Amino acid sequence: QFGKIKIQSHNQLELLETETFTPIKFFVEPIILTINYLEKNYDFNSYHMVGISGGGWTTTLVAAIDERISQSFSVAGSYPMFLRSDTKNFGDYEQHNLELYKIANYLDLYVLASVGDDRKFIQIFNMHDPCCFGGTAFEEYEDNIIATVKTFDNGYFKVYLDDTHREHEISDHSLEIINNEIIS
């Protein structure tokens, strides 16, 4: 409908949106297809997923829709829309796609990623992240998600705050948290 365009950022993906296609597929489908391939060709007992920033957002979404991901870890990945007044937290096209979030908002996704047999969803935020989702705003929803997950009698949700550095990264401290959660 627009002719040829050169996509140079996530925000321009909205130009590809049609009634029958969503670019959200570019984020989700490769992971689902990979898990399908692994299940067909190997005999793994479980799947875990870790992502930072846009990868943390992808981790949240994919874990919410595919229960085969038993443990998922989103580092500096997302806040609910009501906590995104700071422009650095608003995110790219995929993080505020209204059609997607009419189906399930962020709080719904956090619960969906958490519940189920042997399922766990962990968010890690960097206290002094220069990019996005730094600080303690998660405290606005953390207890509500924990309480909601408990009503399902199976599943686990937790948030960690990493104050050991001032970068937009998965620090050694966060890696230790992830490792400890996986083996616990």
Task: List where the protein language model places each region.
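Alpha-helix capping and helix-loop boundary segments enriched in small/acidic/polar residues
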Residues: 18, 22-25, 50, 97-104, ...
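Cap/lid segment of the alpha/beta-hydrolase catalytic domain
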Residues: 1-29
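The feature captures the conserved acid-bearing segment of alpha/beta-hydrolase catalytic domains
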Residues: 80-153
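Non-catalytic cap/lid and distal C-terminal segments of serine-dependent acyl enzymes
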Residues: 30-36, 65-67, 74, 167-184
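Structured alpha-helical segments in the cores of large, soluble enzyme domains
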Residues: 27-36, 109-115
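Flexible loop/turn segments at secondary-structure boundaries
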Residues: 56-59, 79-83, 129-133, 165-170
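Primarily recognizes the serine-hydrolase "nucleophile elbow" in alpha/beta-hydrolase
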Residues: 32-94
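C-terminal catalytic histidine-bearing segment of alpha/beta-hydrolase fold enzymes
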Residues: 144-184
